[in-house]
């Protein structure tokens, strides 16, 4: 429900995919759909893509198509002209439910540097755990009022983002100009995979 409310703040219609498994009951699916619609979702549909591939996602695709056809205006939570810290704090409070945002000296220094270099109007791309609305993967549910640590702030000038790093998270490395997967292949007749070493 919290995710539906968060996406709604951005002015976007929400479609909830209910991953249906053989042990589920229709009553469980109905309860999930009712809660999703009550929270503001455009629709909530059963998906069996894990079992049926594309065919199992047809209803989901149709719902997404309908939702994307509705009039809506996507928006940021903040104007780009406000300070980097103000943008971080709006996201921390309005999206994650944080109380106080706590910056390390390194994060403060980076924010000042990027602002001085003219990147202060970039949008924010928060790097945090996917396992919690907080910075801490062990904190479940919808926490409120916690301290939200920003330990590092990076500049992604080419992509056009300021990236605050929160909690203990590793960011994805970039790929080389010739990623290893380019040399991988599967022989469709024998099933033999090549190029893994």
Where in the sequence are the language-model features?
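P-loop NTP-binding site
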Residues: 1-31, 35-197
